Amino acid sequence: MKKKVLAIALVTAFTGMGVAQAADVTAQAVATWSATAKKDTTSKLVVTPLGSLAFQYAEGIKGFNSQKGLFDVAIEGDTTATAFKLTSRLITNTLTQLDTSGSTLSVGVDYNGAAVEKTGDTVMIDTANNIMGGNLSALANGYNASGRTTAQDGFTFSIISGTTNGTTAVTDYSTLPEGIWSGDVSVQFDATWTS
């Protein structure tokens, strides 16, 4: 009888040790959304981004994902207009790492296969040259009607270059420092009504 009690006590002691040695592992992440609110229904041209951009590094491809960034365009019609042109131009596209490394990433912007550059305008609509704007064609059809016309389309955004410290370019994104980059990607839209 004493042997059974001793054996049960030993088994209980060993079982208790196994439980005591196991440690809980937890991880936590915080998601942050920047938020603003704006309403403008009177300007001649209003462009509203529909969402935000978040690039994630993928180890398997040693690169960052690309994203479709949708936007809404609203214009006020001009009944005296005989032609309409809408262009876009890249203004800012640098993301900077939020530490002391100075590492940067450059975001490329593409519209229907054409790069949107800082050095020139990308034509989105030009009714005089029969460029009707694809998904923005409602604007090409409504620019000379009374009232407002809206349409939605999107850019493709991707990371096109990076630096480890603000000056030293990288060809292999796996060599970038760990961390988070932040910044703005701004595109200027210009609309011209010709009378």
From Swiss-Prot:
GO terms for cellular component: pilus. The keyword Nucleotide-binding does not apply. It is found in: Fimbrium. Coiled coil: none annotated. InterPro entries: EcpA, Fimbrillin_EcpA_sf. Residues 1-22 form the signal peptide. Induction: Positively regulated by EcpR. Keywords: Fimbrium, Signal. Pfam families: MatB. It comes from the Bacteria. Its main location: other. Self-associates. Forms filaments. Interacts with EcpD. Belongs to the EcpA/MatB fimbrillin family. Part of the ecpRABCDE operon, which encodes the E.coli common pilus (ECP). ECP plays a dual role in early-stage biofilm development and host cell recognition. Major subunit of the fimbria. This is Common pilus major fimbrillin subunit EcpA.
